């Protein structure tokens, strides 16, 4: 199961929060982003109860985190599949 956790973070705490988030089991990637949220965290776990533990038990306790929204991925599309599906007659994906 893959989920993305969209985080509101105190602006002064973004680097430290990102570093702490990277150390959490189940967190595979952390991005600093523009827009409504400050950080986006990719979480990969096997079960719903693990996701609940990571999001509420660990991510939510990182200093500087002010709020979150979690979205669960239904399906993953690779770059190659997307490139092929939206190709306008340019280069074909290798593979």
Which residue stretches match the model-derived regions?
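A compositional/biophysical signature of low hydrophobicity enriched in polar/charged and small residues
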Residues: 1-95
């Amino acid at each position: 199961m893959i989920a993305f956790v969209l985080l509101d973070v105190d602006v002064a705490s973004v680097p430290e929060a990102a570093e702490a988030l990277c150390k959490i089991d189940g967190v595979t990637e952390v991005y600093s982003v523009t827009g409504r949220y400050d950080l986006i965290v990719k979480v990969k776990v096997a079960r719903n109860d693990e996701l609940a533990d990571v999001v509420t038990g660990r991510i939510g306790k990182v200093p500087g985190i002010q709020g979150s929204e979690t979205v669960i991925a239904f399906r993953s599309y690779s770059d190659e599949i997307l490139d092929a599906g939206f190709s306008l007659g340019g280069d074909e994906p290798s593979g």
